[in-house]
Design a protein with these regions (language model features):
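Short amphipathic alpha-helical interaction elements located at domain edges
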Residues: 121, 131-139
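Short amphipathic alpha-helical elements of helix-turn-helix/winged-helix folds
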Residues: 18, 42-46, 126, 133
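N-terminal leader segment of winged-helix/HTH proteins
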Residues: 1-30, 77, 86
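Charged, amphipathic alpha-helical coiled-coil/dimerization segments
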Residues: 70-129
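N-terminal helix-turn-helix DNA-binding core of bacterial DNA-binding proteins
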Residues: 22-64, 71
Length: 139
């Protein structure tokens, strides 16, 4: 693999690790696990989603979503009435989603603090293009 691709690969791994570590640190003292964060963050932006919708939005497979939903329900973060009904956050779940978004926003702000306004716009544009490409391939 050419050096530029290796460098990009390791940079992406480090970015992922940075976000994961900041999230874990922010969740200390709660009963939340890092695996809950994509589900809670996705639900925090909606009035409810189905398992299929959560799977599409988060990129997690349905069995992973189902496990997280079961645990989040047992902990009182979500309500799910029936198999095909939307999953809805409880007040506790909304508070958790707000906390997760705050943690991730602070981590993101720290990540891009070294960029000027033009570089930030470019970074966001390139990232959006990459993610659109990935989505088009079924990820």
């Amino acid at each position: 693999m050419p050096m530029a691709q290796e460098s990009m690969k390791f940079s992406l791994i480090r970015l992922n690790n940075f976000m994961r570590d900041r999230t874990l640190k922010g969740l200390e003292g709660t009963d939340l696990k890092a695996s809950f964060t994509p589900v809670l963050a996705a639900l925090g932006d909606t009035d409810g989603l189905t398992v299929s919708e959560l799977s599409h939005i988060t990129g997690l497979d349905k069995s992973n979503i189902t496990r997280n939903i079961q645990q989040l329900s047992e902990l009182g973060y979500i309500v799910k009435d029936s198999r095909n009904s939307p999953i809805i956050l409880t007040r506790k779940g909304k508070d958790a989603a707000d906390l997760i978004m705050k943690i991730q926003r602070e981590a993101y702000d720290e990540l891009i603090s070294c960029l000027d306004d033009d570089e930030r716009r470019m970074f966001i544009g390139v990232a959006a293009k990459v993610f659109r490409s990935i989505e088009g391939k079924g990820f």
